[in-house]
């Protein structure tokens, strides 16, 4: 997983969702940024985002919650994940137990669930996912093409007249 903002710094800075919490029982007052991370494995089609919730009060470096969210149908994740996976867990949203959480994670998950009620926000996540995936796959295709070209050039050099050895008859 890689932050969207690393591949698209200007757009990521402009479009990262943030919320200011005031007088809530379940969260300290202040700003919460919902940083998007997407899969950077070539060819992956998981259609999911991982959200790291960060705060300026902790230098935007401490992760307050990690939330996984997929916007496709359960049937999509059932097919995508195969027999050993739980499509409900893959779809989410849910606190990602393999990544950092705090005692505020459940409250931040509830806040995220409120945010994704906005079709505009979900569409933004989907658009960012598409941009990110196209960028990853383009980069991968370029690296494969470069490797093929290097291999072909090596073959040509090895077959060239200076490298060819004549065998006595």
Task: Name the predicted role of every residue range.
Residues 50, 57-130:
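An exposed acidic His-Trp-rich patch
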Residues 21-24, 48-50, 80-85, 128, ...:
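Generic preference for flexible, low-structure residues
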Residues 112-169:
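C-terminal charged interaction modules
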Residues 21-69:
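Amphipathic, interaction-prone secondary-structure segments
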């Amino acid at each position: 997983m890689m932050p969207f903002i690393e591949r698209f710094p200007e757009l990521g800075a402009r479009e990262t969702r943030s919320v200011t919490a005031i007088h809530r029982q379940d969260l300290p007052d202040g700003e919460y940024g919902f940083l998007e991370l997407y899969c950077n494995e070539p060819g992956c089609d998981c259609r999911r985002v991982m959200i790291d919730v960060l705060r300026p009060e902790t230098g935007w470096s401490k992760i307050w919650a990690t939330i996984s969210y997929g916007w496709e149908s359960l049937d999509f994740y059932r097919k995508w994940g195969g027999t050993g996976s739980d499509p409900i867990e893959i779809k989410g949203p849910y606190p990602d137990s393999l990544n950092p959480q705090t005692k505020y994670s459940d409250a931040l998950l509830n806040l995220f669930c409120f945010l994704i009620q906005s079709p505009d926000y979900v569409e933004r996540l989907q658009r960012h996912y598409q941009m990110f995936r196209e960028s990853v796959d383009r980069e991968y295709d370029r690296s494969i093409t470069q490797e093929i070209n290097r291999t072909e050039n090596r073959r040509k050099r090895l077959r060239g007249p200076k490298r060819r050895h004549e065998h006595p008859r």
